[in-house]
Each structure stands twice: as C-alpha cells, then as structure tokens.
C-alpha cells in the first residue's frame, strides 16, 4: 500500500495527513486514526478550529457529501450524517488540487464546493450546525465552480474558481 496524500495539517506538535482513494486513510503522527473503504471515497481537504476540533471534507458518495469531524484532538473522527444537509444536490464535489476549499476563522468554517453545483457550506458553531449558501460563480459542469476560499475575518472573505479547462476565460469566476 502506497498512500497518495492529499492534505496536511499541523496542530501544535501533531501532524495529520489524509489520503485520497480507496481506502481513505487519516493519519495522526503516522498512526491511522480513521479508515474508510468505498469505491467512491475521495477526501480533499482538512483544517482545524483549535487543537481539539477539526474537519475533513470529501466528495459526494451516494448523493451525500463527506464531512468528518473530530472533537478529541484527532484521536477519533466521525462522519456527519447526511440528513443535516437537507438541501444537498447531486454531483456536488470539491476540487482537491488546491487543498484550499476550507477556511476557518474562530468558531466559523466555510467549505466551498464545485462542479455541477458550486455552493458554500457554512458553520458558525464549530461544525455543530450547517447552512448552505448559493453562489453566483460559474457552475453546471464538473470542471467548473469554486476552487479556493479564504476568509480574513467573520465577514470578509474571497472565493475564486472558474472552469479549469478554459483558463483564459474570465466569466463569473470570483
């Protein structure tokens, strides 16, 4: 087994990495702390609110996006139940190439999706509840949507994207 690492986070003295593909493996300091086996499993990005609480986001499987949450410093991870995303859309995914589709400021988190449907998943309470925000960014095909998101504070942020097959086009991409 040769892991293909997608995301890296360092929290205090702990190093977290996650792989893409089947099986998905999440490591803490070289030890597997979460494993998921599924033909469609693909985790894209990881970030932490603090030294105890963090999240990992992955592409949709069976019509539900994949979000993992830890509340114990990464010793264990729990996949959020799909029912909390009551407005989920089919074929919604995340762009893994950038590892910048999560932004965390204080207790808040923004997760930018892309592809057929490109929206922002927003939590203001360390991932305990989520709102879904529609965006005007170009979308509708698997190559379009938000590629990266970042917030400076609770009210000021920026999302960019477009269509990665048409890098010279500058239409509805920010």
Residue ranges and their predicted role:
Residues 1-174:
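Residue-level hotspots at or immediately adjacent to binding/recognition sites across diverse folds
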